[in-house]
Amino acid sequence: NMAKKLNTDRKNVETISCCTEGLFQSMKILNIGRGDEVIIPSIHFIGAINAIKACGATPVFCDVEKDTLNTTSFYINEKITHKTKAVIILHYGGTPCDLDTIVRLCKQNDLKLIEDNANSPLSTYKGKHTGTIGDIGVWSFDSMKQIVMGDGGLIYCKDKNDIKNIQQESYLGLLSSSGFSISIDKKWWEFDVDRPGRRTIIN
């Protein structure tokens, strides 16, 4: 499975309907909302901008290197303000960003780091898989990607509790202990819901 491929714990990852859904979930997990800014490379897919705008935050575009089309800590640092809450980076075309300097910059400024691995499903940086180095990582498995399954995605969270929340919210807000997950002698037709949710599980 992908957790094994990424050399991470199964409890740190969850399949989702698409990479864009992972970015929407990331905004919610990190409590990003109105008045916040999220720095994002000027070369990126519209789904990431939609995720930022949908929660009321403002996307702030930073420049990229002309040879790799990846952003750098220098370009990110230029855009940091007191409103900045997170940074989304894209590992473009399988080439990882310089994560040492970007991770250091984010820690110095108390910023969350989201890695978009839509173009780099199994890329590594100094022996570690990209997407598992920041706070959150997202992958795409749609029909135009290197790993294809029609449509689908994966999300990694450093905090395993975040994955539990995603599992619940991606299946209509149902608690895992309710409904079809329990045996027939325990009222399988009863469902427990304690929050709103969407149906964004993988098909």
Predicted regions and their residues:
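Short loop/turn motifs at secondary-structure junctions
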Residues: 9, 34, 83, 132-133, ...
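PLP-dependent aminotransferase-like
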Residues: 28-117, 121-124
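Active-site region of PLP-dependent enzymes
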Residues: 120-126, 133-203
